[in-house]
Swiss-Prot record:
Residues 244-306, 690-741 are annotated as: Disordered. This is Zinc finger protein 574. Keywords: DNA-binding, Metal-binding, Methylation, Nucleus, Phosphoprotein, Repeat, Transcription, Transcription regulation, Zinc, Zinc-finger. Gene3D superfamilies: Classic Zinc Finger. The modification Phosphothreonine is found at residue 728. It comes from Mus musculus. It is found in: Nucleus. GO terms for cellular component: nucleus. PANTHER family: C2H2-TYPE DOMAIN-CONTAINING PROTEIN, ZINC FINGER PROTEIN. The modification Phosphoserine is found at residues 164, 301, 721. The modification Asymmetric dimethylarginine is found at residue 836.
């Protein structure tokens, strides 16, 4: 079965249906067998003049050029001359010409061939050898054959052999058809005419047999998958050897040279859908193989059974079967009875199989896998699934694939034949992968094409240490090359081969398609036992149940951050490893996730892939386009948050909405076992317990890790504690505050996470990495850009439930709701005036600051004036007293007089 045919399988109501003819099947194996009829085969027609007596093999070997052109038309070839015909009717007429040439001249002329309706090259009709009636299906032919067997059960047609099989050469060897030339005996022939003469044979019947299943070990062909799988099991050693049976007469009998020549199967080239040209020998001298590739059984006399012995029928109900295995199963139903399903009327041979089938109707899954959380209806299915978690699966292929089921493993091995997928060679480290980007998706479709990002080849393995293999993309190490190959195929490969027939979405695994189909049908068969919420897959249910338990089983060993999914943890580890394999060719920026590189790519082109058909706007993500179409053009917002009143276009957006009001009303059910403190989530409890562990047994926690900051609209003023009002302190001495988290090198501010620090650093650096594509204004955070873009789009998703007024930001809605409630939670500590919003309080506080600054400036001016006057007074008082000295002219007669 090719990969194209596997993509056409749908899964509806726990059954398989063929997309070509809408026929339902109960198992995957049945629909795979049925899909072979829809696969276009390679048919050939030889154009040119056929030279009688020259076969196709000799013509192809000699290269004379009589058959030069091969076109895909025919699949029926004459074994006498090698000529290819278009239909069984043409082959029938052609074979009658050979009979006329071989018959003597005085023989009675052959009857004209019956009028056979034209058969297409792809249709297979079954013809009765007694009355030459045509049937379109094998079941109708079998039921018709029973009427002849009941009338003459011992009468068997004796075939006449025209010639030996012709082995095709390479040009036409790719289309091999198993054709049986069987002839009826003349009506007047008695029992003595075991083999009629050629002259007496006047009519001929052509039966076309397709052997679709070929053993890769011994090149033996089979028609039914049950016989093929039964034969494949013979190539594998049994776990407990059975006792050797005594030699029968068949084993001791020495075959004749004719038997040995015919019974030896000639090796044929392997192919995915190979056929075989052969001529069944049904006379007593030569023994061929039955239509299932097995030798016919012998009787005690050593003679080969004819057609009557090969056609097995039940002696109780005269039902005809094609293999002894089917007959044996049918006879057991007569001995032990059957058990019928009351819902679908299906019959089962044992009560256990009926109970297992009834579990499929009820969709009950009582057996849960402890490793991945998947649920199964039976314990056998769970045990088979648990083998997939073991390091050594039961069946492994050299190409790297591993299988728990032998049937799927045998089907997979057929793909490695000639013309199939070759086996991988010795692991060779690949070169540096080159990244190519596609053109932006057209505006009509609105589809987003993923770029051809680098993928790990199946054979790429880099030995990091003796006996270990390292992945080149994520640096994970594996002990075996098969484990590395499996990891690269399912983790890093972007190939999605399985397609949803309804919406066209591609998936990596067929099980993902089955889970995805439930989104179209609305089926949610997996309810949560805690809250009764239904889910469409067991994995989603197991992931949801972690929200009830608060468990995060996947924890990072570097930073201690916990996750609910292992894939999220693996992506998180790439950040610590500084491994960014996806690089932008234009700006050189590297990313550790491919979709981030894809979104970054559109920033360079300036054109977003998802365009609205009603307006010229485009979006980076599909969900943004869907929200835009629902809210703006359709005006639909049916989902509303009961806590904050925010309206959303879908239930998914409502579930993703994290309402701070609901979080504040939620009870705190997680209690610390050390100090008795209760928190609202398991993550906060783990952070609180980690703080106890870091503080030590004898220390007291001075400060809890900072909780996520709420929006300004949802902040409420914190009332001072009674201890602070009374001015008393606790008896226990307060321990010094412990530094937790990274610190800003500019302002020495502490943060709880590295992400918060990176956002804070943009204040110092002035970086604004989120520009608006409409007006060019840049922002430091993506949430700010998201709120800003609603100004351009006109979206107002937050509506008031009282008056119907809508807002673009949830903070504005919270402020507006206080108009109806009359709440004013923000009060001024200076004058006691209260406000509805923090921004109004902030504006009011500025007036107090201005008044305070004016008063301070006035006080400073008065102080400066007073200081200046005081300085002047101090300077005047500090001047020393100076004695005045009067100087008069000296008289000759008078002496000097100094006034004291």
């Amino acid at each position: 079965m090719t990969e194209e045919s596997e993509e056409t399988v749908l899964y509806i109501e726990h059954r398989y249906v063929c997309s070509e003819c809408n026929q339902l099947y109960g198992s995957l194996e049945e629909v795979l067998v049925h899909q072979n009829s829809h696969v276009p085969q390679q048919h050939f027609e030889l154009v040119g003049v056929a030279d009688p007596g020259v076969t196709v093999a000799t013509e192809a070997a000699s290269g004379t050029g009589l058959y030069q052109t091969l076109i895909q038309e025919s699949q029926y070839q004459c074994l006498e001359c090698g000529q290819l015909l278009l239909s069984p009717s043409q082959l029938l007429e052609h074979q009658e010409l050979h009979l006329k040439m071989m018959a003597p001249q005085e023989a009675v002329p052959a009857k004209p061939p019956p009028k056979v309706p034209p058969l297409g090259s792809s249709a297979i009709h079954y013809e009765c050898v007694d009355c030459k009636a045509l049937f379109a299906s094998q079941e109708m032919w079998l039921s018709h054959r029973q009427t002849h067997l009941r009338a003459t059960p011992n009468k068997a047609p004796a075939p006449v052999v025209l010639g030996s099989p012709v082995v095709l050469g390479p040009p036409v060897g790719q289309a091999r058809v198993a054709v049986e030339h069987s002839y009826r005996k003349a009506e007047e022939g008695g029992e003595g005419a075991a083999v009629p003469s050629v002259a007496a044979t006047t009519e001929m019947v052509t039966e076309v047999e397709l052997l679709l299943y070929k053993c890769s070990e011994c090149s033996q062909l089979f028609q039914m998958p049950a016989d093929f799988l039964e034969h494949q099991a013979t190539h594998f050693p049994a776990p407990v050897p059975e006792a050797a049976e005594p030699a029968t007469q068949q084993e001791t009998q020495v075959p004749s040279p004719t038997e040995a020549a015919v019974s030896q199967p000639e090796p044929l080239p392997a192919s995915d859908h190979s056929y075989e040209l052969r001529n069944e020998l049904r006379n007593g001298e030569a023994i061929g193989r039955d239509r299932r590739g097995r030798k016919p059984r012998r009787n005690n006399s050593g003679e080969s059974g004819g057609a009557a012995t090969q056609e097995l029928f039940c002696s109780a109900c005269d039902q005809l079967f094609l293999s002894p295995h089917q007959l044996q199963q049918h006879l057991r139903s007569h001995r032990e009875g059957v058990f019928k399903c009351p819902l679908c009327s299906r019959v089962f041979p044992s009560p256990s199989s009926l109970d297992q089938h009834l579990g499929d109707h009820s969709s009950e899954s009582h057996f849960l896998c402890v490793d991945c959380g998947l649920a199964f209806g039976t314990e056998a299915l769970l045990l088979a699934h648990r083998r997939a978690h073991t390091p050594n699966p039961l069946h492994s292929c050299p190409c790297g694939k591993t299988f728990v089921n032998l049937t799927k493993f045998l089907y997979h091995r057929r793909t490695h034949g000639a013309g199939g997928v070759p086996l991988p060679t010795t692991p060779v480290p690949p070169e540096e992968p080159a990244i190519s980007f596609p053109e932006p998706a057209p505006a009509e479709t609105g589809e987003l094409e993923a770029p051809e990002l680098p993928v790990c080849e199946e054979s790429s393995a880099e030995p990091a240490a003796p006996g270990s293999y390292r992945c080149l993309l994520c640096s994970r190490e594996f002990g075996k090359a098969l484990q590395l190959t499996r990891h690269q195929r399912f983790v890093h490969r972007l190939e999605r081969r399985h397609k949803c027939s309804i919406c066209g979405k591609m998936f990596k695994k067929k099980s993902h398609v089955r889970n995805h189909l439930r989104t179209h049908t609305g089926e949610r068969p997996f309810p949560c036992p805690d809250c009764s919420k239904p889910f469409n897959s067991p994995a989603n249910l197991a992931r949801h149940r972690l929200t009830h338990t608060g468990e995060r089983p996947y924890r990072c060993g570097d930073c201690g951050k916990a996750f609910t999914q292992s894939s999220t943890l693996r992506q998180h580890r790439l950040v610590h490893a500084q491994h960014f394999p996806y690089r932008c060719q234009e700006c050189g920026v590297r990313f550790h996730r491919p979709y981030r590189l894809l979104m970054h790519r559109y920033h360079h082109t300036g054109e977003y892939p998802y365009k609205c058909r009603e307006c010229p706007r485009s979006f980076l993500l599909r969900r943004l386009l869907e929200v835009h179409q629902l809210v703006i053009h359709a005006g639909r917002q049916p989902y509303r948050c009961s806590s904050c009143g925010a309206a959303f276009p879908s239930s998914l957006r409502l579930r993703e909405h994290r309402c701070a009001a609901a979080a504040a009303q939620a009870p705190r059910r997680f209690e610390c076992g050390t100090c008795g403190k209760k928190v609202g989530s398991a993550a906060r409890l783990q952070a609180h317990e980690a703080a106890h562990a870091a503080a030590g047994p004898g220390e007291v926690l001075a400060k809890e890790p900072p909780a996520p900051r709420a929006s300004r609209a949802t902040r409420t003023p914190v009332a001072p504690s009674p201890t602070a009002l009374s001015g008393t302190t606790s008896a226990a001495p307060a321990a010094p505050a412990r530094r937790r988290g990274p610190e800003c090198s500019e302002c020495k501010k502490l943060f709880s996470t590295e992400t918060s620090l990176q956002v804070h650093r943009r204040i110092h650096t002035g970086e604004r990495p989120y520009p608006c594509p409409d007006c060019g204004k840049a922002f430091r955070q993506s949430t700010h850009l998201k709120d800003h873009r609603r100004l351009h789009t006109g979206e107002r998703p937050f509506a008031c439930e009282v008056c119907g007024k809508a807002f673009a930001i949830s903070m504005r809605l919270a402020e507006h709701r206080r108009i109806h409630t009359g709440e004013r939670p923000y009060s001024c500590p200076d004058c006691g005036k209260s406000y509805r919003s923090f921004s109004n309080l902030w504006k009011h506080r500025k007036t107090h600051q201005q008044q305070h600054q004016a008063a301070v400036r006035q006080q400073l001016a008065e102080a400066e004036a007073a200081v200046g006057l005081a300085v002047m007074e101090t300077a005047v008082e500090a001047l020393p007293l100076v004695e005045a000295i009067e100087i008069y002219p000296l008289a000759e007669a008078d002496g000097v007089q100094i006034s004291g």
